Amino acid sequence: MITYFHFMALSVLSSFLVSTDANTKQTVTININVPQETLMDEQEVFSQNICKLIEYINSKGYKVTLGEAYRTHEQALIYAHEGLGIKNSLHCERLAMDLNIISPEGKLLCTIEEFRPFGEYWESLNEYNVWGGKWKHRPDSDHFQMSDETRK
C-alpha cells in the first residue's frame, strides 16, 4: 500500500511517500522536496523586474514616480463598481504597479504610443509580464503586471 501526503512549507512542496512492506509490515517513509511557486516567489520576481524597468526608463533619460502598487480587495470592489477597474486586480496580490513616467522635457506620458517602448521592454523581461497598454478592452498604458498563471 502506498500513500502520498503533501503540505506547504514556505516555498517548498514536501511530499512524503509512505510505503508498507506486505511481508514485514514495516513502514518506510521517503521525504521528497519539489520546488513550488508561491505568491511570495512571484512578488520577488515582479519586484526585481520593476527595478529593471525603472532602470531602463531612467537610462533613456526619463524620470519615474510610483503610482498605485497595492490595492485592498475592498478598494478593488469599489473601482469595479465604478467601472474603473476589476474586482480581482493583481494590485491586490502585489503583482501589479502603475508607473508615472516623465519625459526629459518634463511632460507626463499618457498615451499608449508614448509608453509602448517601456511596455515592450517590460514584456521582454519575463514570459508572465503583461503591459496594460496592449489590452483590447480599456487599455491601461501606465499599468505593468505579472500574471499569476504560475500558481494555477
Residue ranges and their predicted role:
Residues K25-L39, I101-S103:
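Acidic/histidine-rich, surface-exposed loop or edge segments in extracytoplasmic proteins
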Residues E44-K87:
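Secreted/periplasmic proteins that engage bacterial cell-wall peptidoglycan
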Residues A9-S15, V45-Y56, N100-I102, F144-E149:
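Solvent-exposed, well-ordered amphipathic alpha-helical segments
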Residues P35-V45, E105-I112:
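Second-shell loop/turn segments in exported
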Residues T3, V34, Y56-Y62, I101-E105, ...:
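A generic structural signal for ordered secondary structure
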Residues I86-K152:
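Catalytic cores and adjacent binding grooves of peptidoglycan-active enzymes
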Residues I32-Q36, K63-R71, E113:
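A generic short-segment signal for beta-strand/edge and adjacent turn/coil regions
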Residues M1-I32:
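N-terminal secretory targeting signals
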